[in-house]
Amino acid sequence: MTDAQMADFGAARYLRKSEKERLEAQTRPFDIRTECFVPDDKEEYVKAKIVSREGGKVTAETENGKTVTVKEDQVMQQNPPKFDKIEDMAMLTFLHEPAVLYNLKERYAAWMIYTYSGLFCVTVNPYKWLPVYNAEVVAAYRGKKRSEAPPHIFSISDNAYQYMLTDRENQSILITGESGAGKTVNTKRVIQYFASIAAIGDRSKKDNPNANKGTLEDQIIQANPALEAFGNAKTVRNDNSSRFGKFIRIHFGATGKLASADIETYLLEKSRVIFQLKAERNYHIFYQILSNKKPELLDMLLVTNNPYDYAFVSQGEVSVASIDDSEELLATDSAFDVLGFTAEEKAGVYKLTGAIMHYGNMKFKQKQREEQAEPDGTEDADKSAYLMGLNSADLLKGLCHPRVKVGNEYVTKGQSVQQVYYSIGALAKSVYEKMFNWMVTRINATLETKQPRQYFIGVLDIAGFEIFDFNSFEQLCINFTNEKLQQFFNHHMFVLEQEEYKKEGIEWEFIDFGMDLQACIDLIEKPMGIMSILEEECMFPKATDMTFKAKLYDNHLGKSNNFQKPRNVKGKQEAHFSLVHYAGTVDYNILGWLEKNKDPLNETVVGLYQKSSLKLMATLFSTYASADTGDSGKGKGGKKKGSSFQTVSALHRENLNKLMTNLRTTHPHFVRCIIPNERKAPGVMDNPLVMHQLRCNGVLEGIRICRKGFPNRILYGDFRQRYRILNPAAIPEGQFIDSGKGAEKLLGSLDIDHNQYKFGHTKVFFKAGLLGLLEEMRDERLSRIITRIQAQARGQLMRIEFKKMVERRDALLVIQWNIRAFMGVKNWPWMKLYFKIKPLLKSAETEKEMANMKEEFGRVKDALEKSEARRKELEEKMVSLLQEKNDLQLQVQAEQDNLADAEERCDQLIKNKIQLEAKVKEMTERLEDEEEMNAELTAKKRKLEDECSELKKDIDDLELTLAKVEKEKHATENKVKNLTEEMAGLDEIIAKLTKEKKALQEAHQQALDDLQAEEDKVNTLTKSKVKLEQQVDDLEGSLEQEKKVRMDLERAKRKLEGDLKLTQESIMDLENDKLQLEEKLKKKEFDISQQNSKIEDEQALALQLQKKLKENQARIEELEEELEAERTARAKVEKLRSDLTRELEEISERLEEAGGATSVQIEMNKKREAEFQKMRRDLEEATLQHEATAAALRKKHADSVAELGEQIDNLQRVKQKLEKEKSEFKLELDDVTSHMEQIIKAKANLEKVSRTLEDQANEYRVKLEEAQRSLNDFTTQRAKLQTENGELARQLEEKEALIWQLTRGKLSYTQQMEDLKRQLEEEGKAKNALAHALQSARHDCDLLREQYEEEMEAKAELQRVLSKANSEVAQWRTKYETDAIQRTEELEEAKKKLAQRLQDAEEAVEAVNAKCSSLEKTKHRLQNEIEDLMVDVERSNAAAAALDKKQRNFDKILAEWKQKYEESQSELESSQKEARSLSTELFKLKNAYEESLEHLETFKRENKNLQEEISDLTEQLGEGGKNVHELEKIRKQLEVEKLELQSALEEAEASLEHEEGKILRAQLEFNQIKAEIERKLAEKDEEMEQAKRNHLRVVDSLQTSLDAETRSRNEALRVKKKMEGDLNEMEIQLSQANRIASEAQKHLKNAQAHLKDTQLQLDDAVRANDDLKENIAIVERRNTLLQAELEELRAVVEQTERSRKLAEQELIETSERVQLLHSQNTSLINQKKKMDADLSQLQTEVEEAVQECRNAEEKAKKAITDAAMMAEELKKEQDTSAHLERMKKNMEQTIKDLQHRLDEAEQIALKGGKKQLQKLEARVRELENELEAEQKRNAESVKGMRKSERRIKELTYQTEEDKKNLVRLQDLVDKLQLKVKAYKRQAEEAEEQANTNLSKFRKVQHELDEAEERADIAESQVNKLRAKSRDIGAKQKMHDEE
């Protein structure tokens, strides 16, 4: 979008980058290889440039000039400049945390606060007003697609609105974030946008009959101020923080016009009503009322305008700078009016708010000598009761003495002061919460209109994830809500992403990311989750928070990964459990959760609330029902009880589930709000704070999910247009190619990873980073093309310029030629005549042209007039047509509206029709099914009736079979009993196995302990070895250690100084606090003194008044004496009255108890009532008499009494006022004294803390002084040692100067020096690492001191040696100097002697030092080190072998126990399964047996019937053919019976055929199962063969590698022997010189050797430790593999078990299939034999493979030991080279010194002549030649060492590979063994099954034989009957013929 198009948005620069910025970003230089982000402690990440990469580490220079070195995986690439301030962060090429952070930061710096992040929008709070919400911006965003406009909350809103209209689907906008992030403001903007566009669309129809209420748009907007007044408050982060969540649904009609709205609220923070933190305040409404903007409110609520007068609202701050409470009150009141609240409703809301303020001022005190509470003043109670419409006395009574139901009776319970205050707080919170909920309901009623509504858009404004230092029940509810919303967010986002892949036809395996958080959600909400356990605990009366915690731990600790035990840190709040949420781990404190969840109320006071005269109060608590009232109710009463006692957690879960249900029915849009900083400073972004929110809000998670697939996508046309430049030949210009195919060709022709992109139907999809690579390639291509174009353009320009120059030259030549020709003819007469005639010819031509032009003008004029007339006609026509067009447009618009409505109705009707058709179809199908079922049931009924008639006949026969069945029952019971006994035995086996498992675990733990002990022993041995070797450590090592000690001490000193500074600062802070408290204390004391003086003045005034009061009392007493008689009389009457009343009450109580049942009691009651009436009359008479007397006395003393009464009233008022003031002062004094006590306590605590801090500071000072002293001691010792070292070094240099004089070989030495320097640096690093390890190991002070003393002794010994050498050197020097001074005159002789001595010394040095420095030291060192290292290697190898042996034994034991456990487990499972299968088989066999018995009985009955019929027939035949008619009847009967028998036979044959079909099917299935099992066995055999071949190949490769290693080892040994021979020869030549020359260097060399030995031993120990760890890891991997294999085998066993069960079920269906079982058994037996043979073969093969593995393992161990020896030899060679390097450095220094001395000697010996000088120079040249030869030999030895080192590395690598192969072979062998065991188990199970089936087969075969015999008998009888019937028929036929 261009800048001109962006101008429509009004505030363009706050929404999108300008074109200029985009161009500058694209042209800015950028190197993608060096520009990066690196981590930073303060800023999270900073931009940097990579300087170098080395060894997995990167050195980079940050943008602020700082150089840092970090690991390579911590460096993250920057995106190219074209992605700066990108509007959608999902399009970033390199998407990671720093890229997201810096994109947000750069946009925020440019005030672009909205940014897309994939499918959602991120907004950052600007903390200032931006012009991006006005009407111009609203209009600009209306109807724009997301891609057409910059990111904005209006764009999200408009997209939701357009989706709603086009997709016909409800929408939702989820706005989340922390408090102060701008959620409420963005919610307002969304509502403003919808109200605006709805108002634009429906402005003509806004006619509301109630003008005061306002339009629906106004009401929706005004709902916010009303809810904010009662639901928003100032917090630490936000001055207008919403303390509740809300879901606002805005309903629209079918055409998108606003219809209605409603609001749902969640989690109102009730606790804020009675408690606020210091920097916070209560809800805004309290301070708005107290702002005195509406004085009538203060009068109505009986409050002042001072918030500090009310405890509930003055615990924190009472005013906010950014909020004008008085103006907000007017806005709230106006919002009530717009929302249609009546005056009574408004007054009720204000009264309840004021009553809550008075509630907080109610005071209670403890009764004397009791724990019960009583009111301490009733003024505030009276006010609150008045405002709530209650009786004050009843309210106080209900608070102090509530009625509690105990059993079936009510008991009055006394409350303590603390309980009363808790009850008041709970009631205040409940009143406020219910009032707030009522307001929401009332607003919803106002926003509910009768207009039709089709869809809605919901806006969710809810608190974000909260992780505080103290997290309670509220945080759990909020975090649980966010967990559910995040799950919904993940699911929705990635489902959309994957749907696009599906729509585009990309191959994609669907992944459900929504279940990522299900474990945590289930932990909270599922049965026996946290919420469930909390609700369960709330049901128990004795439950506490600790029982709740114990249940949580029992159910979830160790069972759920999301539930953890927290680590409590000192200084922080205690935490009881931790939950792993998606945003981080949160520690929760459960104190008070049960009370919070139950939220109990004082039911006595609630009962008063229900009877309140204030209508709103009664309405709020009308639905509340207590536990006792709910018990007796039925129907609706029961529901009320359940709802009123619903816990807070259950209610929250119910609301949350409703919310999630609503959200799932909508299309969601997500907005994440971010706080940029805690200081509310505009334009400043705190990186760590923002990163924390991005993680908690799921922004990074959302981008990760969005990017997991193919985040970058481009339409084919756009891709082809932009990237065709990369390879134009791939898409030829002349011919047409489809964009998709063109993109495919183009990408295929590029040199990129072709797995990084996919082709969809309309787009090409890219993985992350590939698009950036294409951009880089495009930029390079463009730069090359532009360079070429520039070159061509410059060439073309120069060619054009050259052409112009040529043309100018040609033109000049032509002009010159013409001028010359003109000059030649200008005076010619004919030419002059031509000049004169030429103009005349032109004038004639012009006249002709003028005439033609006039004619043309006339024609044009006529045409113009015609066209003008025509234009006027057309204009008239156009006007009429425009009018018609407008009319038609109006008609079309109306028709379109009607058509839209008709289409909607049509769609609705079609949907209804489809639904009805589906219902009709379903009903017809159901009807058909019912008819079929009815027909079947009718047939069954008929059949059953027939069977019933037959069964009635068979009852007698069945009785006979009962006995047999009983016997079988007893047999089966015996079998069941045996099975139960077997089960008991199996249970015992299980118990034994569990015990063995425990023992195994204990043995495992013991083995681990032993392993740890062995490691400790190794560590102690290593430490002792280090300690022993440190005793002979050299001077250089000790100095380095002392330097490190000093550095550590300096570090400790700095740390202590920092701690001291911090401590001093904290002490200063405490002292400042102490001073402030003392000042406050002084102020309070001054106030107290003032109050005391006031009290004294008041007391004096009270004394004066008391005097006057006494005088008046004296006068009153005189008058009272006259009234005394009357009083006594009245007292008697009153006493009599009270006695009668008491008797009456007693009588009435007795009457109530007795029930007035008897007539005697009735008569007594009547008598007593008569007496009572008489006494009442007497009393009334006495009262009248008394009143008359009193009236007379009053009249007598009226004047005096009136005066005294007035005085007394005045005095009483004064007294009451004084007492009130006194009580107030007393309360204030109590508060002040309590405050003073608190201050004194705090002061004492602070003094205690300060004393402890001072003690700590003193201890730190003492420690610091000790450290300083030790540091000073170390410094002095170091200086001393340095001086001694310097002296020693100087002496050594002087000694060596005599040996290595005049050596010059720098040029040939430089290359070797560099190599040796690198080796030295590596050795130095290793040395530093060793020193660091030693330092970290020095945890014991005594050990350090001992080591230090031993080192000092070694140093003293060295010092003595050095001092001796020094003395000798000094003697030589003094002697030499004295000789030189004394014999100056004999200079020539001295020079000769000196030359002779030098020559002798040089000869000695030539014989000694050349070979000494090169080989003798090497030989000694190698021998010593080889001996020591061989001892160490043998020791470590022995230890490693012992540990390895233990490990192997342990592995074997573990494997055996595991095998036993698995076998027993499998046996148990198989036995259980077999028991179950046997029971099912028993049941089925029983059923089959019963069926066979039934068949047998039917056959018997049929036989019996036939026999009876035969006997009847024979009897009839015996009687003779008495009657032909009777015989005819008999014949017909027999024919009928014959037909019945034939039908029965046919049915029997059909059933036999059916059973035979079943048998055939079972045979087929069994054959299939058999083929499957054989196929699996064949596959297993092939796998075994393949594994065997692999093993053989691996063993062969191991054998070849071992042979190569053996050959290389032999070669190395040969080289070593040769070197040892050379060394022996050199030793003989140099032994004597060695003793003279290397006396002082042996200590240094021995110390270095010991240091290297120590390092090698430490490396060996580390390697051994690593090997042990690797072995443990291998064991664990083996365990996991065994477990996995076990699971696989279990699955296979279960699968085979299922198939076996199916086969058995089919097998037992009929008795005829028994024969098939027999064949199966035989085949199984054959298979078992085959499997046994295979198993034995496999076992032999496995044993052979195991043996081969063992042999290979032994060979590998040998190779490892050989490699270790070679590595040790290499290490020795390295040590030798390092020593040579040091010797070389010393020699170079000596050469320098000798050169200096030689120069001095040359100056001294200038007079000595040139001959001596020439001799010395010749000698120097010889020495140089020898040195070069020595250097060559040294270089050759270094080359040999490097070769051996490379060989050792190769061998080491080969041995590691062999180890891995061995491990793999071992794992494979273990798997094969397990498989063999599994096959064995399967074979045994198959054999057992075959035996059981065989026994069953035999049993059933026997029964079948019996049944067949019975069937044969029956068949023979039937045949006989048939023959008889045929005979009878023949006879009958013959009889008929006769």
UniProtKB/Swiss-Prot annotation:
Residue ranges annotated for the Myosin N-terminal SH3-like domain, each copy included: 31-80
Annotated ATP binding sites: 177-184
One GO term of the biological process aspect: atrial cardiac muscle tissue morphogenesis
Residues with N6,N6,N6-trimethyllysine modification: 128
Positions where Phosphothreonine occurs in the chain: 378, 1276, 1283, 1310, 1514, 1680
Region described as Calmodulin-binding: spans on this chain: 789-806, 815-832
Pfam family, any one: Myosin_N
In-chain residues carrying the UniProt-annotated modification Phosphotyrosine: 1260, 1309
UniProt subcellular location: Cytoplasm, Myofibril
Ranges of compositional bias, category Basic and acidic residues: 1924-1938
Domain IQ: 782-811
PROSITE patterns tied to this protein: IQ, MYOSIN_MOTOR, SH3_LIKE
Annotated function: Muscle contraction.
Entry text on domains: The rodlike tail sequence is highly repetitive, showing cycles of a 28-residue repeat pattern composed of 4 heptapeptides, characteristic for alpha-helical coiled coils.
Protein name: Myosin-6
Species for this entry: Rattus norvegicus (Rat)
Recorded name of the encoding gene: Myh6
